[in-house]
């Protein structure tokens, strides 16, 4: 059976109408409401919980593959999510992640190097100052994708002392 052109246009208008309605509603995806049961999921959930309870200025995800930042993003915290990655392609992907601000970082070999890279980037911004509390979620040792296993409460500027 062939469809007339009118049917195609009606379907296109209905689709555009749904898109507009969703955009006007804020285009919000509901947050993840259940407690995850995987190691990386629980670590991400805990980092968000700790950051909110401590009134941290931000949650920082140091990520190789982007997965850590995406896991935190889907929890929809009211805190800024700052995603650091040494991979330009991952940074481009994360630019499309809900609520994430992305940073290209150097490759780091240790947690101390990671904290120093975070301090250097954030203290250059007007939004953050020395002594601000952030919560960092990452994998240790750094650089291994899928190894999210660390949460650290960090005061900006601590690496300079």
Give names to the regions the model predicted.
Residues 1-9:
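Single conserved hydrophobic/aromatic residue that forms the stacking wall/gate
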Residues 14-48:
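Long, charged amphipathic helices and adjacent flexible linkers at domain junctions
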Residues 17-27, 51, 76, 80, ...:
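Structural signal for hydrophobic packing residues in well-ordered secondary-structure cores
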Residues 42-56, 115-126, 132:
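Phosphate-interacting basic helix/loop segments used at nucleotide- and nucleic-acid interfaces
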Residues 46-74:
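C-terminal accessory/binding modules appended to enzymatic or scaffolding proteins
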Residues 68-70, 76-114:
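Nucleotide-binding motor/catalytic cores of P-loop/tubulin-like NTPases across gene-expression machines
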Residues 101-104, 120-121, 148-161:
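Beta-strand/loop-dominated core regions that host nucleotide or nucleotide-derived cofactor-binding catalytic loops
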Residues 129-142, 148-154:
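C-terminal binding/interaction regions
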């Amino acid at each position: 059976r062939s469809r007339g052109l009118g049917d195609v246009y009606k379907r296109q208008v209905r689709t555009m109408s749904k898109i507009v309605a969703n955009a006007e509603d804020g285009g919000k995806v509901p947050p993840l409401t259940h407690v995850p049961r995987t190691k990386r999921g629980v670590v991400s959930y805990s980092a968000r919980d700790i950051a909110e309870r401590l009134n941290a200025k931000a949650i920082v995800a140091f990520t190789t593959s982007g997965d850590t930042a995406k896991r935190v993003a889907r929890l929809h915290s009211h805190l800024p999510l700052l995603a650091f990655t040494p991979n330009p392609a991952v940074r481009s992907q994360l630019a499309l992640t809900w609520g994430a601000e992305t940073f290209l970082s150097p490759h780091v070999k240790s947690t101390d190097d990671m904290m120093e890279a975070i301090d250097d980037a954030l203290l250059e911004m007007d939004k953050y100052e020395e002594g601000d509390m952030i919560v960092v979620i990452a994998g240790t040792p750094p650089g291994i994708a899928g190894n999210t296993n660390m949460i650290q409460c960090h005061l900006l500027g601590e690496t300079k002392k």
